[in-house]
Each structure stands twice: as structure tokens, then as C-alpha cells.
Amino acid sequence: MLQWRRRHCCFAKMTWNAKRSLFRTHLIGVLSLVFLFAMFLFFNHHDWLPGRAGFKENPVTYTFRGFRSTKSETNHSSLRNIWKETVPQTLRPQTATNSNNTDLSPQGVTGLENTLSANGSIYNEKGTGHPNSYHFKYIINEPEKCQEKSPFLILLIAAEPGQIEARRAIRQTWGNESLAPGIQITRIFLLGLSIKLNGYLQRAILEESRQYHDIIQQEYLDTYYNLTIKTLMGMNWVATYCPHIPYVMKTDSDMFVNTEYLINKLLKPDLPPRHNYFTGYLMRGYAPNRNKDSKWYMPPDLYPSERYPVFCSGTGYVFSGDLAEKIFKVSLGIRRLHLEDVYVGICLAKLRIDPVPPPNEFVFNHWRVSYSSCKYSHLITSHQFQPSELIKYWNHLQQNKHNACANAAKEKAGRYRHRKLH
């Protein structure tokens, strides 16, 4: 008994061989647990990376949309090839084609061929009807908007019915149709029906329309889940009533848009209009968000593929007028998804049109950029503005636009002198 106590009661008094033996035993146990855990991950990989199947060579980081590959630029060409695959002709139902003989069937886009038979009840719940049809009637329309003048740029602005103050602020600022001398701009607010079924609000919208003639409205419910319908309404309106428009911008009612910079630095009226042109803040390498609690949740039965094609943030993108008809027509053969910007990207992938990057990555911003007249004189979009803020900063920019960066340089020099003195 005394011998056992001398050998085992205290680790500090153990011999070197005993310590080494005990350490080896513990190490083997830990390595065994690590091996078992690794095998568990191997056989249950889908449970640890939602929305992604199989092993991934690239690390992933979580974003607001879902998972994004940190090496997506490297894999962009291969991803584009995946989205350009087609299925054998014998598997396709009768399909429609546009004037360019582009196949408009969803089977032409990898990832959508299996979604046509998915349950469409989610669309009925959102008041949209069949997920592939477009049958909404105009409540308010402006069919002669482009007959009175030949605009260079149409601003399609997604707005909620109750955002009267936001529409008023936009008319006074970046949506002013007389903003650019010698350049015709047309402003159109895109509205659905208020979910509150407010008769007073609808009468106010009708009066607003009679006064400004810049609202189109159709009979779908105006909700976040119907933003895709709202954008398609705008595309169809442009294709129907302004088919020869050089450029279109789709943006939102809470955005700051430097319209002059957009026209003069990006679109350049002195040059011939581009075709099949689409640009904005490029979103590359994004995978569907499979978190059911997320605003951007994408059910696997609606979109089974592992990754979205390249798309532009819906907060603001610009495209050539010829794409309005092409995007709308191709959408008739592609199952509708509630993520509007992703859906437009899918339509572009089906058309074999790649969004192009803007002149620099700082001109389109889907977040709020801290204000300075210098920064805002060299960007196109900034996000999350209240109507009063929009008017305040717009007026300040207009007052300082000819020397927007001069004050910034003076302030920087002053700070440098202050640091040098202290």
C-alpha cells in the first residue's frame, strides 16, 4: 500500500518513465478523439456548410447574402461556364425565343431546370400568383412619357406606396428631370398596392400622379418579397413605352444618387450608346443563404444550385436600354425568385451577358458612405438616407461641387500643421 502511494499519489514525485508513459496515454486519447471528430465532419459535411455540397478547395466567409468564396475571382471563369451549360434538346419543352433567337427556357440555365416543379404556394401567399407568369394590370400608367421627349436616361425608382416624403425629396434632388442641362432625364417611381388597403393613401397617390406624372402602379402587393415583380414591371414598361432609350438606372427610394456624375463620367452622352451593357456594384461568388431565419433565405427546392451567378446589388445598377426587353422576355421562362438583384443576374446569365465592373469599385455603394463633398462628388450611389438627410446633403454638394475637394485638402493640411506643432 505504501509502495502504491509513493508511485501514484503525487505527479510531481513520479519518475520520468512514469510521467512519459502517462503523457503518451493521454496523447493517444486526444488524437483518437480528433480522428473521430474528423471522420464525423467527413461524413456529415452538408450539415456544417449549409447550401454547399461536397468539399470546397477555397475557404469561405459569411456575408449578408450567404457564403462567399474568398477566391471567387479565380473561379469566376469556371463558374460562368457552369451557368452557360445547356441540357440536351430532347429534354426541353416547347420554348419561346426573342428577336435574337435566344432560348428563353429555364432549362438553359443550370440550377433552374429542376425548379419548375417546385411548390409554388410561396408565391400564392405573397399575392403573386403563378411563379412564372406576369399578368398584372396597370392601376396608374404613363404611356406617353417618352413620346413627349426623347430621354437619354430613365430612372426607375422602387418605392413603397406610403413613401410620399421620399418621393418628394427625390424630385427635389437627384431625380430632378431638369438636373443636367441639355440631357433629358425621365423619372419613374415603381409602386404596387399597399398591404394596408388604405383608400385614403391610394387617393393621395392618384393625386400625386396627376400632379407629377412620374408614377406607375400595378395590382400586386407592395412587399419585400415582390421586389422582383416591381423590377420586372419597370423593365416591361421601358420595353413597351421607351424602347429606344439609351440608358436605364434602377435604384431605391432610400438612395443618394449623383446623377450628374453618372451621366458625365459613366454614360458619357457624347459617345455612341452601348448595347448589352450592365454595371453596378458586382457581387461575385455568392452562395444561397440556407438559414431559414434570414431575410435572404433561399429554399433549396426553389434554387438548388450551390452558387449564384455574378449579379449587381439591387440598390443601384445601370444598363443599356436594349436590355430591358431582353431581361423581361427571358424572365418569362425562368422561375421567379424573391431576391430581385439575384434574379436579374440569373436572367443575364441566361442571356449570356456578363455584368461589367464600373470604372472603379467606389462609385457604386450598397452601404452608407460617410459624407464629404469630395467623396460624394466622385460616387454614384450611397445607401440608407432619410428624405431630410437627402435634401441636406444634396444641397451642400450642389453648393460645393465646383471646389468639392478644395476644402478637404485645406482641412487635411490644417490637421497636418496641428500635429506638427504639437
UniProtKB/Swiss-Prot annotation:
Its cofactor is Mn(2+). Residues 1-24 are cytoplasmic. The keyword Membrane applies. Residues 46-422 are lumenal. It catalyses: an N-acetyl-beta-D-glucosaminyl derivative + UDP-alpha-D-galactose = a beta-D-galactosyl-(1->3)-N-acetyl-beta-D-glucosaminyl derivative + UDP + H(+); a beta-D-GlcNAc-(1->3)-beta-D-Gal-(1->4)-beta-D-Glc-(1<->1)-Cer(d18:1(4E)) + UDP-alpha-D-galactose = a beta-D-Gal-(1->3)-beta-D-GlcNAc-(1->3)-beta-D-Gal-(1->4)-beta-D-Glc-(1<->1')-Cer(d18:1(4E)) + UDP + H(+); a neolactoside IV(3)-beta-GlcNAc-nLc4Cer(d18:1(4E)) + UDP-alpha-D-galactose = a neolactoside IV(3)-beta-[Gal-beta-(1->3)-GlcNAc]-nLc4Cer(d18:1(4E)) + UDP + H(+). Pfam families: B3GALT2_N, Galactosyl_T. Pathway: Protein modification; protein glycosylation. Residues 90-110 are annotated as: Disordered. Detected in heart and brain. Belongs to the glycosyltransferase 31 family. This is Beta-1,3-galactosyltransferase 2. It comes from Homo sapiens.
